[in-house]
Amino acid sequence: MKKWLKNVSFMILLFKICLLMGQDLHAKKIIVIDPGHGGKDSGATGLNDIQEKDVAMSLANEVLRLNNDLEKPLDIYLTRYNDTLISLSDRTKLAKALKADLFVSLHCNHSDNPNARGIEVYVTDVISKYSNDATWLAFQLHEDLNKRWGFESRGVKFANFQVLRETMDFTPSVLLELGFLSNKDESHYISEYENLQHIALAILSFLKTSKL
């Protein structure tokens, strides 16, 4: 899923310093992060029995933790804060109520092909007010994760996911598939806390530096 880094801790420290140096005086961006699934909806299950809902929740919490360490953190809200099933409509309504600058839904992939691997970034295939912004941000996120952080990527794709379709009239929205739980290497990689920390930092770095 990525080019293995010999010293992830050093990279985390380095990018936290870069984030701190790059903070500006503009109004805080409001970000809604949607940890996919939850409760009785476990989502995909990995070869090592890891569940998609748990990966998404752990990753979202790690983004929150890293963000709170910043001198000037973003305003980040989650659609769920524990193992609870929240309806898709309620997730999008929260983003609208908060007047979010960006909606990011976190998921893991699964395939009958055990060799399928890599991240995917989705935007809605429905044309709306924020279609261009969402598409641009999706390509920026893909570029960031792939070239800057070394994650294997399957590119930006378009789909009619409900959380994307229902947010596109009031904010740019993207859905990130973090890798394939059906792939032995990626399932193992995602299950390690240090690696989730690496992914979370990559996401936070993108959120902090992107032009929303």
Where does each model-flagged region fall?
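Bacterial N-terminal signal peptides that target proteins for export
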Residues: 1-10
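Bacterial N-terminal signal peptides
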Residues: 9-19
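Conserved catalytic motifs of the protein kinase core domain
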Residues: 10, 28, 171
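Catalytic-core regions of hydrolytic enzymes
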Residues: 24-32, 37-137
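Sec-exported extracytoplasmic/periplasmic mature domains
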Residues: 61-72, 96-100, 108, 142-151, ...
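A generic structural signal for alpha->beta connector loops
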Residues: 73, 118, 153, 170-172
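Active-site-adjacent mobile loop/cap segments within catalytic or ligand-binding domains
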Residues: 105-113, 155-212
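Active-site-adjacent substrate-binding region
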Residues: 132-157
